[in-house]
Amino acid sequence: MTTFTHTRFSAAILAVAIAVAALAWSAGGAAAAVQTVNGTVGPGFTITLTMHGKKVTKLKAGKYRCVISDRSSIHDFHLSGPGLDRVLTAVDFTGTTSSSLTLKKGSYHFQCDPHASFMHGAFRVG
């Protein structure tokens, strides 16, 4: 093998290795995309959790971005489940907030603490 042929062969192997690495990285990045769930509390006495416009009843375990729209200063949004117990919006807060969550397999419950007897919901992760 001449030096010129050896150099071309090495360059071709390097190009293929870079292409394979880039493809693996982009596929891993796409698979690891963080899903967004949307919570709403208020106006009135309503509390919801949706994904893609549909009520959340079951999710896969993993990382999520949780965007809460709190439309009333008399409510909070409290989420609890395996290894998680967080008040995502406080009673005096109105506006939108975002949190990163890691959900593990199990049952989850969300509620407005001051009105927990009738403002609540649940979903499963598994």
Spans of features found by a protein language model:
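Bacterial N-terminal signal peptides that target proteins for export
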Residues: 2-14
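Bacterial N-terminal signal peptides
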Residues: 13-24
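Sec/Tat signal peptide C-region and signal peptidase I cleavage site
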Residues: 25-33
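Extracellular/periplasmic metallocenter environments
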Residues: 33-50, 72-75, 91-126
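Short beta-strand segments of immunoglobulin-like
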Residues: 51-58
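Short coil/turn motif common to extracellular beta-sandwich-like domains
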Residues: 59-66
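Beta-strand signatures of extracellular beta-sandwich domains
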Residues: 67, 76-80
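Short edge-strand/loop segments of extracellular domains
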Residues: 82-86
